[in-house]
Amino acid sequence: MSTVVRSGLLVAGALVVSLVMAPATGAYEEISVTEGGSLSGTVNLNGKVPTPKGYNLTTLPDAIYCGRISDGRGWRLLQPFDVGSKGEFRQVVVHLEEIDKGKPFGEYKAPRIEAVDCRFLPFVNVVRDLHDVVVVNMDPAMHDIQAYETSKLGPRVLFNVPLPISKRYPREAGLSAHVHKHYEGTPVAQTVKMTKGRRVFTMQCGFHAYMESWALVADHPYYTVTDGEGRFEMTDIPPGTYKVKVWHPYVRGEMEQTVTIEPGQRANLEFVVEAPTGRLYANQMVENAYVRYTITEGVQSQIVPTLEKQTYEGGGDE
């Protein structure tokens, strides 16, 4: 059986990211699920893809190495919205809300976040409270993890540690725009310890502000992140009626639908998220950057996008 629900959410532009508070529920109970059903579907973004964040590389460390990915004019772009040519909204968390029992979590494997080419990958993840995340530096440049939980009163620091560089890199590697080989530094494992009721976890590099990674903290195993086609799937769901929510760090609030899971059947949901409008963040590209940042042509000429020349045309894939 297939149940199709299509809905949109109007989101006003804002300079803040979404804040998600956990509902007041008891501990999740792991049970053996019999005649469980499944849920699949898609998430699409409707409207113009928002302008990416923009960072002038001459104002930050490692401009030459990190400038291997840039726009050719000294700017590094960070596009929080990963959207395909047909609106497929990738890297969005889809999860059930207020489910108190169901399938076991299974063996825990700490999420691995890589600092590679001066970006944290993946951009969106799911983590568990009181469990580890593992962060690895794959670059010849120094990175620093600053991890926070969000709150209406402001962020709270969870941990702040440096990321070791692999000793296999020659000393001058971090000063070159032509070093593209990656070596793994010593992995750093840190435990996520959230304040009760808070569910949004974020990391940023203390040296390179355009390096971000976000995660929703899960208290049950019924969650997934949309794939390259904006699709999602969950299995072994106990029969019943549930709220299904969609979360992205730069969309205010969560879209919510209700779905009934029948024994042994598959339900389908289609979510359409209206693209946020207006100015979403403080960091954006500016005109006349030479005047504002006193950038000389000599400095700019050293920042060469030898790995990826970034562009933005206001929609679809970059």
Predicted features along the sequence, with ranges:
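Extracytoplasmic copper-binding redox domains, predominantly the cupredoxin/blue-copper superfamily
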Residues: 26-318
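N-terminal secretory signal peptides that target proteins for export/translocation
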Residues: 1-6
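Small beta-barrel nucleic-acid-binding modules, principally OB-folds
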Residues: 14, 23-28
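Bacterial N-terminal signal peptides
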Residues: 8-20
